[in-house]
Amino acid sequence: MLHPRARTMLLLSLPAVAIGIASSLILIVVMKIASALQNLLWQRLPGTLGIAQDSPLWIIGVLTLTGIAVGLVIRFSQGHAGPDPACEPLIGAPVPPSALPGLIVALILGLAGGVSLGPEHPIMTVNIALAVAIGARLLPRVNRMEWTILASAGTIGALFGTPVAAALIFSQTLNGSSEVPLWDRLFAPLMAAAAGALTTGLFFHPHFSLPITHYGQMEMTDILSGAIVAAIAIAAGMVAVWCLPRLHAMMNQMKNPVLVLGIGGFILGILGVIGGPVSLFKGLDEMQQMVANQAFSTSDYFLLAVIKLAALVVAAASGFRGGRIFPAVFVGVALGLMLHEHVPAVPAAITVSCAILGIVLVVTRDGWLSLFMAAVVVPNTTLLPLLCIVMLPAWLLLAGKPMMMVNRPKQQPPHDNV
């Protein structure tokens, strides 16, 4: 017979598995549709019209029209495509289900149109809203927070293709003063995360790791080098933190989301022309291209880092529906490669992983998630002790500093961007 504790843990197991599978399937469907639309906009249409895919006019035109289209969705859809991601954390309160169709359409348009944001925030919002709405009907005794935790864990597992990130994040979130052991509370979220990760793995494998020269033995000088790299990445990220609320306030003075996002798309188009096609989209596939291109110089990597960071700020400030983690990882990779090219004596594995750690820490203010992203992009067990040590001064630098988020104006309704 099972102990009462075990029976308690098993109560939410089936709902957790169902939520994890559903979270992954929603992500997969959205990404497949966005990929098909991206192929149409950036491959088939230019080829049919006899226009080069990297033509400045095409890049500016597509991104401007993408902004206008997203603005129309936000302006006229019920619920105005959910909350403005610039004003929300990654895991937020559930939104009304009526806002979800507009949010999904706005996300797909942004992903396909080349906007420098990832899918993580909108997908998280959709999955949490559906889990809370459906769960409250089927199992009304389970509170909203439980459904929120299960949906966010399933989504994290689906996004990263592994339950490890969910385990790290929720180990700090659920570690309260309760007498219930931590792993009892982690059981159902990890079931959801594992189900989400395994379902994603059936259709595609998220490819984060980069082909970077293997790092051998850690030396004391490497710790100092890594700390300096992380500090540089944090400094770059804090410039974006300073710019975001100011640009957001400036853009939203226009009140009309169609105008705001149209102008935002036009600016993103100009940045895309300067940075080239590799600086567009969410950044995961593009960072693979960046590493594979041996022709890039120090100045090229610097330009890509600056352009991508600027595009991230503009996209978030304009109200595009998307997340900031994936493009931030691209910025970290570009910064790391730039610093390695500038000082070849410091291994690329150190510069890239520590730059990712620093910039993701600025964006998320989550130490575990930052360590996870650095470790999966540069998968090397020898780096783990170094990254843990480098995290300490990085965390000190950011203690008490503002987050990369905009304070919501008091007069703005919770899910209205007009």
Curated annotation (Swiss-Prot):
One of its GO terms (cellular component) is plasma membrane. This is Putative ion-transport protein YfeO. GO terms for molecular function: chloride transmembrane transporter activity; monoatomic ion channel activity. CDD domains: Voltage_gated_ClC. The chain crosses the membrane at residues 10-30, 54-74, 99-119, 120-140, 149-169, 186-206, 223-243, 258-278, 300-320, 322-342, 343-363, 371-391. It is a multi-pass membrane protein. Keywords: Cell membrane, Ion channel, Ion transport, Membrane, Transmembrane, Transmembrane helix, Transport. It comes from Escherichia coli O139:H28 (strain E24377A / ETEC). InterPro entries: Chloride_channel_YfeO (IPR022969), Cl-channel_core (IPR014743), ClC (IPR001807), ClC-type_chloride_channel (IPR050368). It is found in: Cell membrane. HAMAP family: CLC_YfeO. The keyword Transmembrane helix applies. Belongs to the chloride channel (TC 2.A.49) family.
